[in-house]
């Protein structure tokens, strides 16, 4: 697996570079600061953070490559046969929180796991996806986001996008709120249904599609005027983001349980957030429309070319 792991690592480092360059160019003011780190138990990474920009209030694009003698519980709980195997985990994970409430928060992740044991075949899989969390949503943006996701999946089978779109809707669901985190996109894990080269090609297609999915939305919305009321609603909705990441997110749990770097793991949290007791938007308002129309696990491409 050594050559394969090296190829995945080369791609992920290049992907991090390309995404950071594209986001810096779009912001036009802020620059990513890099923090290279090492994990005492094995491995390390490159954390890149950005903030206080013309567009991005807070964001991060992280690369990590960690390894150890046994998988943490979050990774082996649904695959107990992997308990006791040594592992390597590589990935790029990013979250972008724009200041303007009309520009959605975006998240993307592509990752590779390999679990090995002497005398046995290695077990490997890929995971990843991308999802969008709007505050003042636009149907045009939702359709675009999902169209790019569908087109990235298309060369790998007509059933791939619907299956991973539904998985995304199911995964990014706040059970205690009974509502989605956002308007979804793609999510998949344990991907080894094809040969390695095909799975790796799929991961590259998804990683490369993120900028094509996100930047046109940013460009359409970043100059939309906003007021303090809309910023307050954004902070309220960001609370849902925090709740999901700290309670349900498998990547967060894996990082914390495997002795990962806390600052990098919690990089995904927004800079300002608020909770109000039993707060509800005014009926018929833009804020109410978010949950009533957009956060409903819709088929955004129904009737679309």
From Swiss-Prot:
One of its GO terms (molecular function) is metal ion binding. Keywords: Cytoplasm, Heme biosynthesis, Metal-binding, Oxidoreductase, Porphyrin biosynthesis. Pfam families: Coprogen_oxidas. A divalent metal cation binds at residues 97, 107, 146, 176. Substrate binds at residues 93, 109-111, 259-261. The keyword Oxidoreductase applies. GO terms for cellular component: cytoplasm. Its EC number is 1.3.3.3. GO terms for biological process: protoporphyrinogen IX biosynthetic process. Residues 241-276 are annotated as: Important for dimerization. SUPFAM superfamilies: Coproporphyrinogen III oxidase. It is found in: Cytoplasm. It is an enzyme of class 1 (oxidoreductase). It catalyses: coproporphyrinogen III + O2 + 2 H(+) = protoporphyrinogen IX + 2 CO2 + 2 H2O. Pathway: Porphyrin-containing compound metabolism; protoporphyrin-IX biosynthesis; protoporphyrinogen-IX from coproporphyrinogen-III (O2 route): step 1/1. The active site is at residue 107. Involved in the heme biosynthesis. Catalyzes the aerobic oxidative decarboxylation of propionate groups of rings A and B of coproporphyrinogen-III to yield the vinyl groups in protoporphyrinogen-IX. Belongs to the aerobic coproporphyrinogen-III oxidase family. Homodimer. This is Oxygen-dependent coproporphyrinogen-III oxidase. It comes from Pseudomonas paraeruginosa (strain DSM 24068 / PA7) (Pseudomonas aeruginosa (strain PA7)). The lineage of its organism: Bacteria, Pseudomonadati, Pseudomonadota, Gammaproteobacteria, Pseudomonadales.
